[in-house]
Amino acid sequence: MHARVSTYQASDPEGLMEGFRSVSDSLEATDGFSHAYLMVDRDSGKAMSITIWDSEAALMTSVSQADELRKRATQPSATTIESVQHYEIPMIVGTPARA
């Protein structure tokens, strides 16, 4: 499994969350997508998204679509995309949580 970790600075965390809700169906329809997390510190406006992918190939194939979805999710709230990084997931402990 592989992950894409993106960090953000949001002046409107609620707007950012709504933006991510608006693109979630498109994300779920992407080949090789497993699941995702959005974490928000409402006080500081810092946020992070983690998307989990079945393989490195799926992660890399989704790069341009993920870029577009990230822009669509962040534009309405004027959120700044600070970084996007890719990681291998060599180990998982427990069961992924559902919100």
Residue ranges and their predicted role:
Residues 1-48, 54-99:
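Short S/T/G/P-rich N-terminal loop/turn motif that feeds into the first structured element of a domain
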